[in-house]
Amino acid sequence: LLTVEEATSHWDCLDAADAIIMGAPTYMGSLSAPFKSFMDATSHVQYAEKRWDGKIAAGFTNGGSRGGDKQNSLIQLITFAAQHQMHWVGLGLSYGNNRSNTNDEILNRDTYSLGMVGQSNIDQGSEVAPPSSD
């Protein structure tokens, strides 16, 4: 597990990995600035030398709102993976909270298929948000 700040000092770990699972918070309908900076930093060597070609990729995001345009963040991650010729793997869970007999404790409660999405109330700390189902 690497933060984006750590990742830029450990390219060898990412280059040697069979899969890279990426995650970043969604702010204002987009990936966070530090993650975007990480993405841009891959263009000089990883992209130019196709070091991630053929790797498995997956991703997740978390935001303060139930919707919050998190789909856009997942699409950014998928596009980034595709630019590196990686193979994206979706969430693989059926839709969650879309029936009268389900609740917020069900997996994939916000019903995304491209990747994992979480929601954290902005007035609560990380000890309680996001909920364990996310």
Predicted regions and their residues:
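Gly/Ser/Thr-rich helix-start
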Residues: 24, 30, 64, 68-69, ...
